[in-house]
Amino acid sequence: MPGKLKVKIVAGRHLPVMDRASDLTDAFVEVKFGNTTFKTDVYLKSLNPQWNSEWFKFEVDDEDLQDEPLQITVLDHDTYSANDAIGKVYIDIDPLLYSEAATVISGWFPIYDTIHGIRGEINVVVKVDLFNDLNRFRQSSCGVKFFCTTAIPKCYRAVIIHGFVEELVVNEDPEYQWIDRIRTPRASNEARQRLISLMSGELQRKIGLKVLEMRGNAVVGYLQCFDLEGESGLVVRAIGTACTLDKLSSPAAFLPACNSPSKEMKEIPFNEDPNPNTHSSGPSTPLKNQTYSFSPSKSYSRQSSSSDTDLSLTPKTGMGSGSAGKEGGPFKALLRQQTQSALEQREFPFFTLTAFPPGFLVHVGGVVSAGSVKLLDRIHNPDEPETRDAWWAEIRQEIKSLAKALGCHAVVGYSESTSICEEVCILSASGTAAVLNPRFLQDGTVEGCLEQRLEENLPTRCGFCHIPYDELNMPFPAHLTYCYNCRKQKVPDVLFTTIDLPTDATVIGKGCLIQARLCRLKKKAQAEANATAISNLLPFIEYEVHTQLMNKLKLKGMNALFGLRIQITVGENMLMGLASATGVYLAALPTPGGIQIAGKTPNDGSYEQHISHMQKKINDTIAKNKELYEINPPEISEEIIGSPIPEPRQRSRLLRSQSESSDEVTELDLSHGKKDAFVLEIDDTDAMEDVHSLLTDVPPPSGFYSCNTEIMPGINNWTSEIQMFTSVRVIRLSSLNLTNQALNKNFNDLCENLLKSLYFKLRSMIPCCLCHVNFTVSLPEKEINQGTSTASPKNFDKKQALQTTKTPVEKSLQRASTDNEELLQFPLELCSDSFPSHPFPPAKAVTVERASPVGDGNFRNRSAPPCANSTVGVVKMTPLSFIPGAKITKYLGIINMFFIRETTSLREEGGVSGFLHAFIAEVFAMVRAHVAALGGNAVVSYIMKQCVFMENPNKNQAQCLINVSGDAVVFVRESDLEVVSSQQPTTNCQSSCTESEVTT
C-alpha cells in the first residue's frame, strides 16, 4: 500500500457531564478513516479520561489520504440505549504529505458539536508513513504545496510561474435530501460538514494533478469557495496560480529573502527624491534579488484540458518595471510579440497573485470585469459538472477578450465570486489587464547584445502607469497626459487596479480606504422572470458603483485605486453593490481635477445659492483631505534639469468612440489635470442624494488611517504587535419604508458602524492604521442585511513618518517585540494547562490574540522552535501575509475549515450577537488548535470567506455557516535571530548583514 496512517488517542479533558446521576461521563472514542473504524476502551466516570490507546493503523492509498478527512468522534457509553454523541474532530491529513512539512500532528483539539459548540478537548497524535510510488497513472498529487497568500511565499524562490489552474466539484447538498426530513439537525449538519471536507480534499487533489502536469510543485494564491445552491446542489470550486518553488535553506540566502515588511517599510527607499511628501509604496519585495523564470509552453501531453498558462520570463536582479525609453523600439516589439505568443498558447493567461517582484509588470491597463446571471438547475450527475464549467469558461473568455482590447496579454489580481438567491446565481470575475515583462525569454532567440541594450535603459518607477494601448485607437474615452515622472510616455488621468501597490511605485502622501455602497430594490419574481429583472438591473448598479468610486477618489484628491474588490449580492427583493479599494496619489499621474456641480434650473435664485453652497463644501472637503493625507505634489516646471518635457501642444488624435468623428483632434497638455473637468449634473432627486452622500461620508477619527491592502502607502514604520479584529453586524429592515434612499442609508450605516466599532475599540492605539480591511455583505433573508469585516490594526511612529530621507537601519527601525505588548488592545493570557472557557472578551468585535490550547511541549519533532523566549506558544492570526517584526521560517500547509453551528435556544444564548460572537470565538479556537498541533505558531493570509447567518425568531432558532482559510506557519522574531546571528562567527555575521542591507 502507498501509505499507512497511524492514530493514537491519548486523553481528554473538560468533557461535559453526560450522566446526570453521577455528574460524570463514560467516554470512548471512535476513529474513522474512509470505511474503517476503530474504537477505544470506555473510560468510566471521568470528565478527564486517559485512554492512552494503542496505535490505530489504516493502510490506504495516497489518493484517499488527500480526499478523506480523519474523523474522531467522542461518545458517551450508555448500556441500555444508544450512545450519546459528545462531539467530533475533523483532521486534514494533507499537511503531513509534504516532504518539507511536519512529520506528526500532535496536540489538543477542541471537540466540536454543531448544536452545543465546543465540549472539551481531546489529545491526538497522527503520523503518516508514505511509500514511494512511481506509477505514472496515479491519481494523487502528494507533495504539491498550497498557499493562500497572493504573493510568492516568504523563504521560497520562484523558479517558474506557470499560470492559471482551476477546478470545481459538485454534489448534492445533504441539507436538501429527502432523508433530512427524518434525521436530527445534528446528523444533517455533520453530514454536510463531512461532505464539504471530502469535496475540499478532492478539489485540492485534482488541482494538484494539473500542477504536476505543468511540471510545477505549488499553487500560490489558492482561493477556494463554496456555492450553496440549495436544492440544486453544492459546488466547491477553486482557482490559483501554479508555480515551481525552491526552498531557501542556506542562511545567507534565507535571511534577506524572509525580511519582514516591518523592517523594510521603516525606511524610505528613494532617498534621492527631493519631495518630502513622496514615499515608497511599501517594502521592497523579498524576491528582489531572486531569479524568476517564465518558460514558453512545453510540449507534453495533457490528459484533460485545463485553464492554465505556462509562460516563462526571467527578470534579472535589480531591473525595475516600466518602459524607460521609447515604446516603439523594434527589439522591444519583437520581445513583446514573443511573450504574447507564449501566453496565447494557453487558454487563460490569468494570475491570482496581487503582489509581484519589481520589473514583473511592464504596463497596467486597468480593471476588467465580467458577469453573468444564470438559472440554477439540479445536478443530475456529480461526476460530470460540465454545466458549471461552461458557465465559468464563458466568463473567463470575456475577461480575456477585454484584456486584449486594452492592449494587454495577461490578467493579474484575478478573482471569481458568486451570489445565489433561490434559483438565480450571479457569476462575477474581475482582474487587472497587464503587460508582463517580455525580457530575457528562455527560448534562446534573444541574444546577449539585445539584453545589454535593454539594460541601458534605467528604470523610472513609472512604467506600469503608461498606457498599454494605442492612443490613436483607444478602447474607451479617456483623457491622456504625459507622464509626470519621465515626461515621455502617456498616462491616464486615473488608474483602477485589483492588485497591491507595486513596490517600485512613487506615492505622494498617504493612502486611504474608499468605498462605494449601493442598494436597489427589485420586484419579487420567480425563475426566468427573476433572472431577467436582475440582468436588467446589474449594468446600472455597476455604473453607479463606478461613478461613486470616481467621485470619492476625486473628493480625496487622489488619482489611483489599488486592491479594488467589487461584490454584488442578490436578495429576494433587492440588490446590493459594495466596492472597496485603497486610494493613493501616484506621482506619475496628473493632479485630479475638482468636482463641479451644475444644476438644471439656472434662473432659480435659491436653487443657485444651494448649488453654490454645496460647491463650496466640496471644495473645502477636497482641501481638507489633501491636508489630512499630506498630498502636496510638486509644481511641474520646465526648468527641471535632466527631464526633457515634450512640446505642450503635441498633436494627438484620439478616437473616443465609434460615433465620434475621426477628424476630431484633442490637444493634450501637462496642465490638463488641474482643470475642473469633472461635472456632476443635478437633474433629479437621485442626483441630489448622490451629492449629499459624498458630503456626508464620515471621515475616520483623528489619528486613524485605513486601507484594504496589506501595506498602507506612505507609512513605513510599524511599531506594534500583530492583532486582528472581526466584526459581524446584522440589521433587520422595516418593510414599511423600503425605498432606494432608505436602503442606501441603512447600508451606509451598516458599513460605517462596522468601522466605528473598530475605531472605538482601538482608540488607545492612536496613531493607528487599519490594514487589510475586508468587508463582506450578504442578504441571508428577505429583510435582513448582514455585514462582516476583518482588519489588522497596527501602530506607527508619527514622528518618523514625517522624516524625508533614508535613515540608517539602526535609527529608523523599531522592531515589534514583546516590549510593545502594552500596545495590545487586549493583553494575552497565557495558560498552558487549561483551555479558557471564555476565550474572548464579551465584545462584538472579536480579537484573536488569545492563548493557544497547546503548550510548548507539543512543538517537539519540529525543524525550528517557533518562539525561543516564550514558555507558551501563542498562535497568532492575521490577514496579512507577513508578521511585523518577525521572519517566517516554515510553511506547514493550508488551513481550510468549514463549520456549521445551529441552536434552538437563540434568546438564551444572548440573541443574535451572543450566538455569533460565541461561534466566531469557537472557530478561532479550533483554527489555533490545528495550527499548534502541526507545530506552527501563526496563521497568515487568514480570511473568512463565508459567514452565512439564518434565523427563525418565532421558533427561537438560528443557524450559521463559516468558512475560513489561511497558511499555517512557523515564525521567529527578529530579536531572536539577532541573538543567533551574534553567536555565529564574525565573517558569517558580516556577510549576512551586508546582504540584508542591500535587500532593504
From Swiss-Prot:
Keyword check for Acyltransferase: no
Residues modified as Phosphothreonine: T317, T601, T666, T807
Post-translational modification note: Phosphorylated on Ser-197 by active myristoylated kinase AKT2; insulin-stimulated phosphorylation by AKT2 regulates SLC2A4/GLUT4 translocation into the plasma membrane.
Cofactor, how bound (note): Binds 3 Ca(2+) ions per C2 domain.
Region (Disordered): 265-330, 639-669
Binding site residues for Ca(2+) 1: D19, D26, D76, D78
Record-listed Ca(2+) 2 binding positions: D19, D76, D78, D84
SMART domains in UniProt: C2 (SM00239)
GO terms under cellular component: cell cortex; cytoplasmic vesicle membrane; plasma membrane; ruffle membrane
Biased composition range(s): Polar residues: 274-289
Compartments, as annotated in UniProt: Cytoplasmic vesicle membrane; Cytoplasm, Cell cortex; Cell membrane; Cell projection, Ruffle
Compositional bias annotation for Low complexity: 290-318
Biased composition (Gly residues): 319-328
Protein residues bound to Ca(2+) 3: D78, S81, D84
Name of the protein in question: C2 domain-containing protein 5
Organism: Pongo abelii (Sumatran orangutan)
